Amino acid sequence: NYTSALNWPNENDYRFKSFWPADLHLIGKDITRFHAVYWPAFLLSAGIEIPKKIFAHGFILNKGEKMSKSLGNIEDPMELVDTFGVDQLRYFLMREAVFGNDGNYSDELLINRVNSDLSNDLGNLSQRCLSMVNKHCNKKVPEKNSLNDIDHELLSLPEAKIEKIFDMMDKFQINSYIEEVFYIVSK
């Protein structure tokens, strides 16, 4: 079980002390009853603290269907990483799979999301910023004291949203957090 991997029942072991109780026990929605009812009862009966939070995530659907070996529609994550890149795959899953709900996957959806958000929006913003620094700032990022009012206004956007963003992260609303980031990117 999870605690024996941390050298339990030796509660003085550094692994157990460092990692238990879990701040978050992340599980699939199909095993919620066991992990939210029975597992905590087992832990309590053994005198072990229960995880601080339990969160059940949805499934990643392949073209609208639950992935299944018998259906033959499973995607090998390592092949996806080799094809698209680990950061692109992580971004896609965090953006498209709303925690607690199912999310759809297809190569086409991944390619479109990465091209739209990362290449077009974020990539174009980066290119425009670097071009402006090159053209108007003698190829050096300007010091903060040399910025104008518009610069300061743009830089204040993330600061104004920081509390909202922390709240989203605490509630596992990662996709909403990403939407806030891309709202700022669009400005």
How would you describe each model-predicted region?
Residues 137-166:
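Acidic, turn-prone loop/beta-hairpin segments
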Residues 1-135, 177-182:
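Structured secondary-structure scaffolds
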Residues 129-133, 137-140, 169, 173:
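Long, hydrophobic, amphipathic alpha-helical segments used as structural scaffolds
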Residues 121-124, 128, 153, 157-160, ...:
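Charged, amphipathic alpha-helical oligomerization/scaffolding segments
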Residues 164-179:
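Acidic, serine/threonine- and proline-rich low-complexity regulatory regions
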